[in-house]
Curated annotation (Swiss-Prot):
Keywords: 4Fe-4S, Iron, Iron-sulfur, Metal-binding, S-adenosyl-L-methionine, Transferase. The lineage of its organism: Bacteria, Bacillati, Cyanobacteriota, Cyanophyceae, Acaryochloridales. The gene is cofH. SUPFAM superfamilies: Radical SAM enzymes. The keyword Plastid does not apply. This is 5-amino-6-(D-ribitylamino)uracil--L-tyrosine 4-hydroxyphenyl transferase. Catalyzes the radical-mediated synthesis of 5-amino-5-(4-hydroxybenzyl)-6-(D-ribitylimino)-5,6-dihydrouracil from 5-amino-6-(D-ribitylamino)uracil and L-tyrosine. Consists of two subunits, CofG and CofH. It comes from the Bacteria. It catalyses: 5-amino-6-(D-ribitylamino)uracil + L-tyrosine + S-adenosyl-L-methionine = 5-amino-5-(4-hydroxybenzyl)-6-(D-ribitylimino)-5,6-dihydrouracil + 2-iminoacetate + 5'-deoxyadenosine + L-methionine + H(+). Pathway: Cofactor biosynthesis; coenzyme F0 biosynthesis. PROSITE patterns: RADICAL_SAM (PS51918). CDD domains: Radical_SAM (cd01335). InterPro entries: Aldolase_TIM, CofH/MnqC-like_C, CofH_family, F420, FO_synthase_su2, rSAM. Belongs to the radical SAM superfamily. CofH family.
Length: 393
């Protein structure tokens, strides 16, 4: 405990602009069990209070008191998927009665609605549908989607297609990751979601998403995107079967990825880190049995949020909670544990909501602004790449 107490000293953390991987693991190993047995409504135990204070002060030191958000729309264009991830309640076989695959007219209508509501970003991802081809080519189909959207709405920032989707397209068409990313970037993909990361530890992936790309492939695709000038986000799926050591291995991979982008002076890098707590109310039975709880545990999520700021903050300065998974109240609490961004309005969300999330599928800019004001912070609308939109509010 003496080591943990030393780590928790606010002065040490602020002087060093963060903590080492060894210190972070020691904190997680001690703080997570404490958080699991503590009542979030009661006063925090001293260690958790010190952790919260340190992460909040480091956030203020690194990015200030402005809290950002983006007006965007999420479009999941198909739930047809060839994979069977243990945590996923979204995917369907093509023959399922509730399988869907949006046509381009519907997609463009959704984009038009978003633009009319002030959206600057469309986030678009979908299941891995082998039938999604244009002239026998997966890449041409994805290019068609992008080209149609950007032709009709050239002003919109298109944040689209995860590393898993990039690998899927490359496999289907027999081309390299670089060729796929470059071709999509050329027709209008502006940035890439850092999803499909789950936990970047193959022992975990082999159990919860055995058909997904391995850790090395995810890292290779994201680094390739940075090298080609495509910015990405980064994520972690937490609160299921992973251990504190797994969590730290994941954070170290992200830190090393960002460090490499900076050292090699790549034209793009990681814009933000988003912690995604597991929601499994309607997930497949095996995963629910492994995990033993169906909704996010708020205090352990906040502890990991804080440690992510302390370890990653000097490399990835923008940290975002998931209001879809935590609810807006929980996400607002995370702004006191190291986060400085509340994410997007989304307007619709299907992947988490069908798993039983209780946070909703869309939130208004006014609700985000009110949540930020409730903490005495200053709201600022932003672009996907964290440039300000309009005046501070």
């Amino acid at each position: 405990m003496q080591t943990i107490a030393a780590i928790a000293k606010l002065e040490e953390i602020l002087t060093n602009n963060g903590i080492s991987a060894q210190q972070a693991l020691a904190l997680l190993t001690t703080a997570l069990p404490l958080a699991t047995t503590s009542d979030p409504q009661e006063p925090l135990p001293p260690l958790l209070r010190a952790l919260q204070t340190a992460s909040d002060r480091l956030r203020q030191q690194q990015v200030g008191d402005t809290v950002t958000y983006v007006i965007n729309r999420n479009i999941n264009f198909t739930n047809i998927c060839e994979q069977h991830c243990a945590f996923c309640a979204f995917r369907r076989d093509a023959t399922a009665s509730d399988a869907y695959w949006l046509n381009i007219e519907t997609i463009l209508s959704k984009v038009a609605e978003a633009v009319a509501q002030g959206a600057t970003e469309i986030c678009m991802q979908g299941g891995l549908n082998p039938a999604a081809k244009e002239g026998g080519s997966s890449l041409r189909y994805y290019q068609f989607l992008v080209r149609e959207i950007k032709t009709a709405f050239p002003q919109i920032h298109l944040h689209a297609f995860s590393p898993q989707e990039i690998q899927f397209i490359a496999r289907e068409d027999g081309c390299s990751y670089a060729q796929v990313i470059a071709a999509l970037h050329e027709v209008g993909v502006d940035s890439m979601p850092g999803t499909a990361a789950e936990v970047l530890v193959d022992a975990v992936r082999s159990k919860i998403c055995p058909e997904k790309i391995r850790t090395a492939t995810w890292l290779e695709i994201v680094e390739t995107a940075h090298r080609l000038g495509v910015w990405t986000t980064s994520t972690m799926l937490c609160g299921h079967i992973e251990t504190p050591a797994d969590q730290m291995a994941h954070l170290q991979h992200l830190q090393q990825l960002q460090q490499k982008a900076l050292e090699h002076d790549y034209p793009a890098r990681i814009t933000e880190f988003i912690l995604l707590p597991y929601v499994g109310e309607l997930a497949p039975k095996a995963m629910r049995q492994w995990v033993g709880h169906h909704q996010p545990r708020l205090l352990p999520t906040l502890v990991l949020t804080a440690v992510a700021r302390l370890f990653l903050g000097q490399w990835i300065v923008n940290h975002q909670p998931s209001w879809v998974k935590l609810g807006l109240r929980g996400a607002t609490m995370a702004l006191n544990w190291g986060c400085n961004d509340l994410g997007g309005t989304l307007m619709e969300e299907h992947i988490t909501s069908v798993a039983g999330a209780q946070g909703g599928t869309g939130v208004s800019p006014e609700d985000l602004v009110a949540a930020i004001h409730s903490l005495g912070r200053t709201p600022q609308q932003r672009t996907t790449l964290y440039n300000p939109v309009g005046e501070r509010q």
